[in-house]
């Protein structure tokens, strides 16, 4: 469903290929790194749609304005955050030690591949790959950071009630 949304937004904003690249790279890193999860399915659908829309708009803006240095800088900051926090499990799907190590390793590999794609596409000014990969790291960075804040808050709240 969300791939279709990304494609539709890509067609509307005239960045079809970029929207597909964004969605694929985001799904790869998200699947293994984890991050924020909404409480309800409806909230998840709304937030996911808005997140995809914001990223496609960001990609479109990168085609209109030279924001490559800003995208590169923000992406690298979020890459460090993802590297530190991944994988982020949830109370609904906690990870045991073996799973944690596996997901961390895979997350780092995927993150490294996306960073290489960003750097190479930045050097060669290949914006079709650069902007979508940056958008995927920015979104995942926001989600993993938000997820970590939510997790710490819930743990503190639970321990204060005990």
Where are each of the predicted segments found?
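Interfacial aromatic-anchored transmembrane helix boundaries in multi-pass membrane proteins
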Residues: 31-47, 53-54, 58
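Structural signature of hydrophobic alpha-helical transmembrane segments
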Residues: 9-23, 70-77
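Hydrophobic alpha-helical transmembrane segments in multi-pass integral membrane proteins
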Residues: 55-67, 110-126
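Small-residue-rich transmembrane alpha-helices that serve as helix-helix interface/gating elements
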Residues: 130-145
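Membrane-helix boundary/juxtamembrane motif in polytopic membrane proteins
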Residues: 89-112
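C-terminal ends of transmembrane helices
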Residues: 26-38, 85-94, 145-149
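Cytoplasmic-side transmembrane-helix entry/capping segments in multi-pass membrane proteins
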Residues: 39-50, 69-74, 98-104
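Alpha-helical transmembrane segments
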Residues: 66-80, 135-136
């Amino acid at each position: 469903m969300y791939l279709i949304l990304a494609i539709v937004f890509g067609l509307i904003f005239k960045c079809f290929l970029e929207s597909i690249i964004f969605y694929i790279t985001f799904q790869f890193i998200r699947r293994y790194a984890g991050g924020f999860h909404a409480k309800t399915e409806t909230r998840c659908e709304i937030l996911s749609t808005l997140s995809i829309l914001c990223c496609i708009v960001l990609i479109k803006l990168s085609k209109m304005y030279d924001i490559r240095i800003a995208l590169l800088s923000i992406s690298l900051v979020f890459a460090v955050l993802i590297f530190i926090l991944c994988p982020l499990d949830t109370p609904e799907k906690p990870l045991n030690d073996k799973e944690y190590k596996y997901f961390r390793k895979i997350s780092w590999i995927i993150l490294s591949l996306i960073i290489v794609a960003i750097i190479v596409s930045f050097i060669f000014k290949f914006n079709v790959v650069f902007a979508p990969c940056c958008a995927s790291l920015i979104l995942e960075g926001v989600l993993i950071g938000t997820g970590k804040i939510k997790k710490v808050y819930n743990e503190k709240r639970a321990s204060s009630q005990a």
